[in-house]
Amino acid sequence: MGRVSWIIALYLTINVVIVVNGDRVTRNVEVTAEEEKIRDKLGYEAIRDIHRDMDDDHSGSIDRNESTGFMKEDMQMRGSERTRRENKFHGDDDAITVDDLWEAWFESIERTWTNERLVEWLINDVNLPSIVEAVKAKKIDGKILPRFASPNSDFLNKELGIKSSVYRQKLRLNSLDVVLFGYKDNNNRTKDILLAFLALLLTSLIFLYVRQKQKAQQKVNELSNKLTELKCMETEFEDVQKMLNDERSKRSISDGVVNHTEMENLRVQLEEAERRLEANSNGSQAPLALQPLLRRTCENEMAFLEKQRQDCFKEMKEAIEMVDRLQKKQGSVLSSLKLATGAASTSDQVDSKIFALKSRMEKIHTLTRETQERWLQIESLCGFPLLYLNETEHINRSIASSHFYNKSHEGSSSSGSISNAHSNPNAVNSNFVKKVSPPIPPSQQTANLRFVPTEQSDSIHSEDTSPIVEDVAISRSLTQDLAEADMQSIVSGSTNGSGSVAALKKRKGIFPKLFRRNTSKSSSLGGTSN
């Protein structure tokens, strides 16, 4: 029984010892900076050498002026980097002692670097791959960095075998930067990502700029093509107008070659026809009284169309100037930035304006043609010229004014002339001779009708600044195709005394026949002018 008790007591003692030893192994031991001075004497000595090198006045503490001078002279730092390191080194303490410097190094992350991290720092940041093998062989970690940075240490020469003073100085400065101010990762991923994003954004902006510039160039080319088409239409319109003027001139020249005999016969026939119309009709003077009103209406309508055409030419000139300004502004930096940002461009307004101008010119051209056809038809129905006055304008106006504004006087005179024809056969011939005016030379046988707009408009060309004056010179011989038998019967009837009245009554329908022949003539002329 006593032996069993001893065995149990020995077993319990062994378990207690094992538990106590296990607790000691897993316990986390905290080492202070003061204790670390004793454990890492060489590191503390290196920190003290660095502090002594920075303390110029040997007061036992490093102020801001001393740290600034050390960074400028020994570490060759300038600008914002020096300011950043100075603020990190001092913080809120303007006097840094040896213990402060040792505690800052003791609590730094760089002191816990492993051998692999130290080798990576030597390769990537210091760029000294030649000493990597020696560092790996000696299994050096981050605690050795103060000895690298110490100005009085022979560790670099003796332990690592660095013979080059340039390499030693390079390693010393980099180690001093890490010990005093901490490690700064130059390969900042955030910066790389930001730079990549900016590069992508710049590439996208350049692509959009090129795309918008191509679209703008394409739109300008389209506008230029449309403007060229508009100019072609203008040229065609002017050519047609010129052809029309040439045709009118040719007709006036061809009609002006009428000989002296035909002109005399024409005047005699007109005189006789008007006498018969006044003697044998009651209240039939309305068509002749309507003639000046219709002519005035025709002139006003043609002047309005001419005004519309001049306005169209003016807007066409403004469109050309706008396209020229758009082409000049295309190469400017401001225009390129507007195109890149997708701002509204004025080219859409120019495009719509050119389309509206084109449609308006076509409408004016169609309306002008329809107006000419309509007035030619009115001429055919009325039997007197309205659109283009001929050489008989003065005769017709004098007849209309004398017979309708002095109706009572002329009515009595015409009836007296007929009664005198019964008693005096030669009276008719004398009246005919008195009213026949001298023949008009061929050069003066045409009358000109000028359509002048009420307001001066600028045309599309610089030489068209004067108002457009359109000379219309087409002579109309109302009785060119009258038969010789009708003329002879009128003249013979006037010379036969008592038979003159019967002859006049027999030829009573000559003036309506004259109107019918004039209608066919006007229709043929209207078809040709169109």
Swiss-Prot record:
In this protein, which residues make up the domain named EF-hand?
Answer: 42-77
Q: Which GO CC terms are listed, alphabetically? A: cytoplasm; dendrite; endoplasmic reticulum; intracellular organelle; neuronal cell body; plasma membrane
TM regions (residue ranges): 190-210
Location(s), subcellular: Membrane
Question: Which membrane topology describes this protein?
Answer: Single-pass type I membrane protein
- Disrupted gene: resulting phenotype? Sterility due to dysfunction of somatic cells. Affects the store-operated Ca(2+) (SOC) activity.
Residue stretches in coiled coil:
208-329
Q: Could you tell me in which tissues this protein is expressed?
A: Coexpressed with orai-1 in spermatheca, gonad sheath cells and intestine. Also detected in neurons in the head and in the uterine epithelial cells. Heterogeneously expressed in the intestine with strong presence in the anterior and posterior intestine and weaker in the midsection.
Composition-biased stretches, type Low complexity, lie in 411-424
Q: Which GO terms describe its molecular function?
A: calcium channel activity; calcium channel regulator activity; calcium ion binding; identical protein binding
Q: What is the effect of changing residue 57 to A?
A: Sterility along with defects in ovulation, slow growth and stunted gonad development; pBoc arrhythmia and fluid accumulation in the pseudocoel
Record GO biological process:
intracellular calcium ion homeostasis; ovulation; positive regulation of engulfment of apoptotic cell; positive regulation of smooth muscle contraction; reproductive process; store-operated calcium entry
Q: Which SUPFAM superfamilies match?
A: SAM/Pointed domain
| Alphabetic keyword roster | Calcium, Calcium channel, Calcium transport, Coiled coil, Ion channel, Ion transport, Membrane, Metal-binding, Signal, Transmembrane, Transmembrane helix, Transport
Q: How does it assemble?
A: Homodimer. Interacts with orai-1.
**This protein is called what?**
Stromal interaction molecule 1
Native source species: Caenorhabditis elegans
